[in-house]
Amino acid sequence: MRNRLFAVICALLALAMLPGGASARAKKAPKKDIGIQLYSVRSLIGVFGKSQGDYKPVLKQLADMGYTSVEAASYKDGMLYGQTPEQFRKDVEDAGMRVISTHCTLNLSDEELASGDFSKALAWWDECIAAHKAAGAEYIVVPSMRKISTLKDLQTYCRYFNEVGAR
């Protein structure tokens, strides 16, 4: 009697777990959003207008590896990797990823730093920001800046970056 009761309880427990187990196996794990900075593959795709060839196969390989987004690193003269921002975005999306950010910068000239008038640099940033929006980038990262030697220069750079950020 005890053995039979034990067997029935075990069978009921197994049946109770089966639907949950089956549905859990049927569901796919959510895809993780993992991005890659394209600067890390610059030897394959080039940077700053110096193309190493067609970057589309590299984008496809990155997507096949599981990457879902990219950070570009080759903005120059309104172009990303030698393409219009719209074409670059299309190429990235055709590979199955999205452009999430880029990294680029424009350091102030000695004259701009001394005068505190960086309106020319801000005009460049306006064009840069418009291009990056067209490429689908949500963020622009400034990866580096020139060496600052005085508090006044640092304060000028702080005002400069605050102006850029407000755009």
Sequence positions of predicted segments:
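Bacterial N-terminal signal peptides that target proteins for export
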Residues: 1-9
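Bacterial N-terminal signal peptides
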Residues: 9-17
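Boundary/entry segment of secreted carbohydrate-active catalytic domains
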Residues: 27-55
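Hydrophobic faces of well-ordered beta-strands that scaffold small-molecule active sites
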Residues: 32-38, 70-72, 99-104, 140-142
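Conserved, mostly hydrophobic/aromatic
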Residues: 36, 62, 70, 92, ...
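Acidic-and-aromatic substrate-binding clefts and catalytic sites of carbohydrate-active enzymes
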Residues: 42-52, 72-85, 107-121, 146-155
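Catalytic domains of carbohydrate-active enzymes, especially glycoside hydrolases
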Residues: 55-75, 135-139
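Active-site acidic/histidine proton-transfer and metal-coordination neighborhood
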Residues: 91, 98, 109-167
